Curated annotation (Swiss-Prot):
Assembly notes: Interacts with CUL5 and RNF7.
Protein name: Ankyrin repeat and SOCS box protein 12
UniProt record, GO biological process: protein ubiquitination
Matching PROSITE patterns: ANK_REP_REGION, ANK_REPEAT
Keyword Repeat: yes
Positions of the SOCS box domain: 268-308
Length: 308
């Protein structure tokens, strides 16, 4: 992030001069209708030009935002619907550069998330915010929300947008890392199914090259004493089992995760497992990670490809 990036952020978040001095009553009326979850009143107001011109204006206490951001944060689905029908900017930013989708994800409002995505919201959130909807859903264990985001094209290898000097922090901030550390096995598996890299949760070699000693997911899972299922999933999805260095303490050999890793190192991967890896990687490279159901193969093999 450079000075030009910072200047761009502030320019986006600065309110228009005329907005600062006008429309206070209209903005308050729109926000009050959203607060009250009164979609009928909101619809009536937005049919009037004096109110509609402020549909994308940021206002309110705390974190000033648009009416759509407010509706998304409260989970007021009907208000979200009315605002979108009247042309509200689906990716409008609040003063923290967060989109309505990010706000809906943060508050766990699945139906609002689904409606915003169907209206064209960017599943990755704003490029001007350090976090992303996928990172938030992975951290919170919001499986259904994460599934919606990934199904609408969100990147499973998304990274927090940190400056170069903090890249050593970013290397361990991917959604897989968060799902593992916070113990959300279902989200962890889902991310892998959508093509998350099982080694570093990062496919940006430029970023990895700037990290002096990047830690693999296997290392992180072992360090945090994650359940053996996490280790097994990483092995099954093709993680490099020779990357992490194992502890020299003999007592650590009793750890179930380390036992799994040692067993994988000592046992050649089966031809069936290798075939599954090749097929899944080919589908991911073609951005078709969920196309297994379309393959002309027996159902039992489709289930195997989906790790079921």
């Amino acid at each position: 992030m450079n000075l030009m990036d910072i200047a761009k952020i502030f320019s986006l978040l600065q309110p228009e001069k005329e907005e600062e001095d006008t429309g206070t009553g209209e903005k308050q009326a729109l926000n009050q209708a959203v607060y009250d979850n009164d979609s009928c009143t909101l619809d009536h107001l937005l049919h009037q030009e004096r109110y509609k011109r402020f549909i994308n204006s940021r206002s309110g206490w705390g974190i000033p935002g648009t009416p759509l951001r407010l509706a998304a944060s409260y989970g007021h689905l009907n208000c979200v619907k009315v605002l979108l029908e009247h042309g509200a900017d689906v990716d409008s930013l609040d003063v923290k550069a967060q989109t309505p989708l990010f706000t809906a994800v943060s508050h766990g409002h699945l139906e609002c998330v689904r409606m915003l995505l169907e209206a064209g919201a960017c599943p990755s959130g704003s490029i001007y915010n350090n976090c992303s909807p996928v990172l938030t859903a992975s951290r919170d264990g919001a499986f259904a929300i994460l599934q919606e985001l990934l199904g609408h094209g969100a990147e499973a290898n998304v990274k927090a947008k940190l400056p170069v000097w903090a890249s050593n922090i970013a290397s361990c901030s991917g959604p897989l890392y968060l799902a593992a550390v916070y113990g959300h096995l279902d989200c962890f598996r889902l991310l892998l199914l959508y093509g998350a890299d099982p080694d570093y949760n990062c496919t940006d070699q430029g970023l990895l090259s700037r990290v002096p000693q990047p830690r693999t997911l296997l290392e992180i899972c072992l360090h945090h004493n994650c359940e053996p299922e996490y280790i097994q999933l990483l092995i099954d999805f093709g993680a490099n089992i020779y990357l992490p260095s194992l502890p020299v303490d003999p007592t650590s050999q009793d750890d179930k995760g380390i036992k799994l890793l040692l067993q994988a190192r000592a046992t050649p991967r089966s031809l069936l497992s290798q075939t599954r890896l090749v097929i899944r990687r080919s589908l991911c490279r073609a951005n078709q990670s969920q196309a297994t159901d379309q393959l002309d193969i027996p159902p039992v093999l489709i289930s195997y490809l989906k790790h079921q």
